[in-house]
UniProtKB/Swiss-Prot annotation:
GO molecular function: autoinducer-2 kinase activity
SUPFAM superfamilies in alphabetical order: Actin-like ATPase domain (SSF53067)
Record-given protein name: Autoinducer-2 kinase
Predominant localisation class: cytoplasm
Phylogenetic lineage: Bacteria, Pseudomonadati, Pseudomonadota, Gammaproteobacteria, Enterobacterales
Record EC number: 2.7.1.189
Similarity comment text for this entry: Belongs to the FGGY kinase family.
Keyword Glycoprotein: no
Enzyme class per UniProt: transferase
Catalytic activity: (S)-4,5-dihydroxypentane-2,3-dione + ATP = (2S)-2-hydroxy-3,4-dioxopentyl phosphate + ADP + H(+)
Record key words, sorted: Cytoplasm, Kinase, Transferase
HAMAP family in the record: LsrK
Coiled-coil blocks: none
Any one Gene Ontology cellular component term annotated for this protein: cytoplasm
Length: 530
């Protein structure tokens, strides 16, 4: 029997996942990794190339052993990763520096680049690439030019972290549009580099590697890589891509107008656009899909999953113990409790992530507003439900922004990731958005999408998009409760007004933003003196 291997480099861990050709997950090898903070470099988060390659190889060995497979059973390999993380190589093709997606050292360089063309440069970058400077590769390259000229001068090629893994396996350097698109240096419309953007930024444009579409063959596993990874020499290595876009492929979200909410540490609201375009208000990010010729509007809710974990760990020690004794997940127990709280959570309004404003991206200080001192109305179950409702409200706000600039009218959405495990959360998302919600069976949608790319490149599948639609299986479906629509519409309007006031407190220096984009310059709002 034939099998496919996906190597998935996430923010906090690396996974090697083996699938059969029917999309069934056979085994997984996983290892956590940590990124390196450089002394005296605030916001730095370097990617440990040597250690992380060893961990990736370890995961491949684990996956093969757990599946009881030989290397010859793996017909093809592809790699995917977190977006925004970049790797630089010297003229010999050896990696010399890398940073993770969360590296925020270049705040000053972001501000410096924004001043170009009388403060129009960021808009020019966005119009071409769908990206702003905050997460772009250009400020990081400029930081290296300023602070590590030895690395900058020696850099001959740039790729993404997924491409680094593929290069370690095959010896071939290239990027794909879905991941490289997040550098802010790739043309969203042509799906190729735009060297003029680097020229305008005063950066070298001779470091841009070849662009190959997801699902095309890059090379084959080398003898050296085979000895380290346990894979068979000569196994095809196929172009992978960005984690979110490949996740959409694994969910069958491959047609124009289709919509997904991916619920993890961050929540992404993703919409396949009928035509490639950007948002005139610069609120929404636009990325190349792994489907050739297609772009995705992507909005992001910050720390949604992390907020739930904080609430569980900070306030629900008793529930964690009870859940452990009952042999169930603590979140499932908290959902049971929250299910007894009426819709609207007695008016409690969580203030955590704002809706996405890509050009001016920051959030209020975390808080709960409108608490009651009645313990029957305001307790852990109430706050947990309020957090779930708020995550759905932020998602609905983000989807509304996408609809306004794209003209897409949503018919349904796919809900996947850790958040989708909760039946209550899935129902709340349906009620708040007014859309039918489908939850897939697959637990590793990104890895499955990556495996589909691997199989397509090896000739085992004829078409990536058609295969994604064929292999996805649905676990549950939820329909909106019309009785809750008016309530949630009113809650959304109130929350938006309250959140705007909370941002005013941040602007005045009275509270601290939960997160703000690197290089953001805010003008404090005038407030009356006491």
């Amino acid at each position: 029997m034939s099998y496919l291997l996906a190597l998935d480099a996430g923010t906090g861990s690396v996974r090697a996942v083996i699938f059969d050709l029917h999309g069934n997950q056979i085994s997984v090898g996983q290892a956590e990794w940590k990124h390196l903070s450089v002394e005296n470099v605030p916001g730095s988060m370097e990617f440990d190339l040597d250690t992380n390659w060893r961990l990736a190889c370890q995961c491949i060995h684990q996956a093969l052993e757990r599946a009881h497979l030989n290397a010859a059973d793996i017909q093809s390999v592809a790699c995917c990763s977190m977006r925004e993380g970049i790797v630089l190589y010297d003229r010999n093709g050896d990696a010399i520096w890398a940073c993770a997606n969360v590296d925020a050292r270049a705040s000053r360089e972001v501000a410096e680049l924004k001043e170009i063309h009388d403060y129009r440069f960021e808009s020019e970058v966005y119009d071409v690439s769908g990206q702003t400077l905050a997460l772009s590769a250009m400020p990081r390259l400029l930081w290296l030019a300023h602070h590590r000229p030895d690395i900058y001068r020696n850099a001959a090629t740039i790729t993404m972290i997924s491409d680094w893994l593929a290069a370690k396996l095959s010896g071939e350097l290239a990027v794909d549009p879905s991941n490289a698109g997040t550098t802010g240096m790739l043309d969203l419309f042509s799906r190729d580099w735009r060297p003029a953007l680097l020229d305008m930024a005063g950066l070298r444009a001779d470091i841009l590697s070849p662009v190959k579409e997801t699902g095309t063959v890059l090379g084959a596993v080398t003898k050296a890589a085979a000895s380290q990874s346990g894979l068979r020499e000569g196994t095809p290595v196929v172009m992978g891509g960005g984690d979110v876009q490949l996740g959409c492929l694994g969910l069958g979200v491959v047609r124009a107008g289709q919509t997904a909410v991916l619920g993890g540490t961050f929540w992404q609201q993703v919409v396949n656009l009928p035509q490639v375009r950007t948002d005139p208000d610069m609120n929404i990010r636009v990325n190349p899909h792994v489907i050739p010729g297609m772009a995705q509007a992507e909005s992001i809710s910050f720390f949604t999953g992390l907020t739930m974990r904080w609430f569980r760990d900070a306030f629900c020690a008793e529930e964690k113990l009870i859940a452990e004794r009952m042999g169930m997940d603590a979140y499932a127990l908290l959902e049971e409790m929250a299910n007894r709280v009426p819709a609207g959570s007695h008016g409690v309004m969580p203030i955590f992530s704002d809706a996405m404003h890509f050009k001016q991206w920051y959030h209020a200080a975390p808080s709960f507003i409108n608490l009651s001192i009645d313990p029957e109305k305001c307790n852990k179950a109430t706050l947990f439900r309020a957090l779930e409702e708020n995550a759905a409200i932020v998602s609905a706000c983000n989807l509304a922004q996408i609809s306004r600039f794209s003209g897409v009218t949503f018919e349904s959405l796919v809900f996947a990731g850790g958040g989708a495990k909760g039946a209550l959360w899935s129902q709340i998302l349906s009620d708040v958005t007014g859309l039918p919600v489908r939850v897939p069976e697959v637990k590793e949608a990104t890895a499955l999408g990556c495996a589909i790319a691997a199989g397509t490149g090896a000739g085992l599948y004829n078409d990536m998009a058609a295969t994604g639609e064929k292999l996805v299986k649905w676990s549950r479906e939820f329909t909106p409760n019309p009785e809750h629509r008016e309530l949630y519409d009113g809650m959304m309007q109130k929350w938006q007004a309250v959140y705007a006031d909370q941002l005013g407190l941040v602007d005045s220096g009275l509270t601290t933003s939960m997160w703000q984009a690197p290089g953001l310059v805010r003008v404090p709002s005038p407030r009356p003196s006491p």
